[in-house]
Amino acid sequence: MNEKKAVILLSGGLDSATVAALAKTEGYACYSMSFDYGQRHRAELRAAERVARQLGMVEHKVIGLDLGGIGGSALTDPAIAVPESPCEGIPVTYVPARNTVFLALALGWAEVLGARDIFIGVNAVDYSGYPDCRPAFIEAFERMANLATKAGVEGQGFRIRAPLQNLGKDEIIRAGLRHGVDYGLTVSCYQADEEGRACGRCDSCRLRAAGFATAGVTDPTRYG
């Protein structure tokens, strides 16, 4: 019997850790992928390694990219400040084409592995408004994946799985806890220090803290 494989986009944050746990629960042999893309919050890479070990990923791969060479985001350009108060519209923490690039590389690895499912922790409820987290984007990428790959055109189609798409942050946290996620291992902060301590002020920190509060669960986040 062939092993059921999946590629998991694992940033080291709360959402992607939850997705990895859900995929494991579904019986997948999970291969996780993270990206060192020039992000200011590089502590998330160490968090991803911790989560991959805790959840038993078959292999954890870190791909180097220079999205800082493109710029245009507070996460890759130190000259652009990370906002510490809510703002209207798409915030400057949006990284141009990030999820498109990440999914494309995950797709390539999935095809090599013979995996048909790619899991991503995007969410369109408690989120920052990024266009590449929306259901329409995920659906469009899946269509493209099955037109652009050898496996896809030969009838062995890919699925882009986004199980958190319509969940609130509190629902995500409760689901992760049911499936064994240790959120103390994760880093969500956009400007976490080298030790992974959070600022408590950026949009990602606010969403995370509100999620734990609404879920009625102790928040294990370490603050600087």
Swiss-Prot record:
Q: Where do the annotations place Zn(2+) binding?
A: 189, 199, 202, 205
The superkingdom of the source organism is: Bacteria
Cofactor needs = Zn(2+)
Q: Which GO terms describe its molecular function?
A: ATP binding; ligase activity, forming carbon-nitrogen bonds; zinc ion binding
One GO BP annotation is: queuosine biosynthetic process
One Pfam family named in its UniProt record:
QueC
Q: Give binding positions for ATP.
A: 10-20
Q: Give its E.C. classification number.
A: 6.3.4.20
Assigned keywords, A-Z:
ATP-binding, Ligase, Metal-binding, Nucleotide-binding, Queuosine biosynthesis, Zinc
Q: In which pathway does it act?
A: Purine metabolism; 7-cyano-7-deazaguanine biosynthesis
Catalytic activity, reaction form: 7-carboxy-7-deazaguanine + NH4(+) + ATP = 7-cyano-7-deazaguanine + ADP + phosphate + H2O + H(+)
Q: Which CDD domains match?
A: QueC-like
Q: How is the cofactor bound?
A: Binds 1 zinc ion per subunit.
- Which residues lie in coiled coils? none
Q: What does this protein do?
A: Catalyzes the ATP-dependent conversion of 7-carboxy-7-deazaguanine (CDG) to 7-cyano-7-deazaguanine (preQ(0)).
| Record family assignment | Belongs to the QueC family.
Concerning PANTHER family, the annotation shows: 7-CYANO-7-DEAZAGUANINE SYNTHASE
Protein name as catalogued: 7-cyano-7-deazaguanine synthase
